[in-house]
């Protein structure tokens, strides 16, 4: 399928005599045996003009992402409905190596020419920063010491790449991340949102959430969730609200069919098998529903995980202790729904997404209320 995108681009470049390279994630993915669906192409020439011409030639859509940097995107949907992206940008710096040194991580700082990427020559990337060596060693390393400061959204990408490729940040990378953390506040909310959704889609998601907390990222992105730490609850709860929340996310991930085991699954209640058995006859219909996109590249499964993550954020503000020592959170679901909506608005989620999550948080106590009713009192309408 990349040929349907890159061969027309190759012809455009041949016609215009501009030089270009495929760089970044597509090169990395090809090296580890993955078939990419997005391609970064660096051009020594007018990248926006080429992007517009490519979109016209293949029947795709063209967007300007950064006019000053000559950064454009082409989006194309295959006959099977799969979405592909080609990002074209003008080369920064006087050489290919200088351009690579301005990128985020060494694993994304490898490039090949279009002929090699399309199979017309040996696939031997230009790799001056030893990104392939880091990929094989499981290291996540910055291209430059100030890479996080240059673009703080890379802080979230670091967590995502660790989870997606089984990497670990080097000590120097972690130190640089800590120093750059305050810069997350100046990142456009839409960019934070996109990284958060991508993290939610990589199982086991709780591992990434714990990593975000350890690194101090969670309070910067979802302070309402970070504030759940240490908020105690009465029996039958055995964890504080924060740990309860993470285990709810893990349970939701299993409910959604994740095949990558999460350590939190070992503490699921005995009746969990009954729940899964009850769902089995309708499994295909459930999956079809979960995979529906509520917004571009945002399937409903991501919103279900997000709702699980936010479902109890109203508890700290509603916590009371009865004379007998019992802890209560009256109307926490209503308060939590309002706060969840505010947080998602701040992150520029769509109105449809906000409504779905808000409804789930507001009504998350209903199944419990129905379950504890005597059988004869359960009514359906």
Describe the function of each predicted region.
Residues 1-381:
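Catalytic cores of the polymerase beta-like nucleotidyltransferase superfamily
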């Amino acid at each position: 399928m990349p040929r349907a995108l890159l061969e027309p681009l190759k012809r455009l470049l041949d016609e215009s005599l501009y030089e270009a390279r495929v760089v970044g994630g597509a090169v990395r993915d090809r090296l580890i045996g993955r078939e990419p669906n997005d391609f970064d192409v660096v051009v020594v020439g007018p990248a926006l003009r080429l992007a517009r011409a490519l979109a016209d030639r293949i029947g795709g859509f063209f967007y300007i992402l950064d006019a000053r940097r000559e950064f454009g995107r082409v989006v194309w949907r295959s006959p099977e409905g799969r979405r592909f992206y080609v990002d074209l940008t003008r080369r920064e710096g006087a050489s290919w190596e200088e351009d690579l040194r301005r990128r985020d991580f060494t694993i994304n700082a490898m490039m090949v020419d279009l002929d090699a990427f399309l199979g017309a020559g040996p696939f031997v990337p230009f790799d001056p920063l030893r990104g392939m060596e880091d990929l094989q060693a499981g290291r996540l390393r910055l291209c430059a010491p100030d890479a996080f400061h240059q673009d703080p959204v890379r802080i979230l990408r670091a967590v995502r790449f660790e989870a997606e490729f089984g990497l670990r940040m080097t000590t120097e990378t972690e130190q640089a991340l800590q120093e750059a953390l305050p810069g997350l506040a100046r990142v456009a909310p839409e960019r934070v949102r996109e990284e958060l959704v991508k993290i939610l889609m990589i199982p086991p998601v709780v591992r990434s959430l714990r990593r975000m907390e350890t690194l101090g990222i969670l309070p910067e992105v979802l302070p309402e969730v970070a504030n759940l730490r240490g908020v105690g609850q009465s029996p039958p709860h055995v964890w504080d609200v924060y740990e309860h929340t993470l285990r709810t996310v893990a349970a939701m991930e299993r409910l959604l069919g994740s095949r990558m085991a999460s350590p939190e699954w070992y503490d699921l209640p005995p009746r969990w098998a009954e729940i899964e058995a009850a769902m089995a006859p309708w499994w295909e219909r459930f999956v079809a529903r979960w995979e529906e996109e509520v917004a571009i590249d945002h399937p409903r499964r991501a919103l279900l995980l997000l709702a699980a993550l936010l479902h109890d954020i109203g508890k700290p503000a509603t916590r009371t202790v009865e004379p007998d020592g019992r802890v209560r959170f009256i109307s926490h679901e209503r308060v939590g729904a309002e706060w969840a909506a505010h947080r998602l608005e701040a992150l520029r989620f769509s109105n449809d997404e906000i409504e779905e999550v808000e409804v789930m948080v507001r009504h998350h106590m209903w199944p419990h209320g129905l379950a504890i009713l005597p059988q004869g009192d359960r009514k359906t309408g």
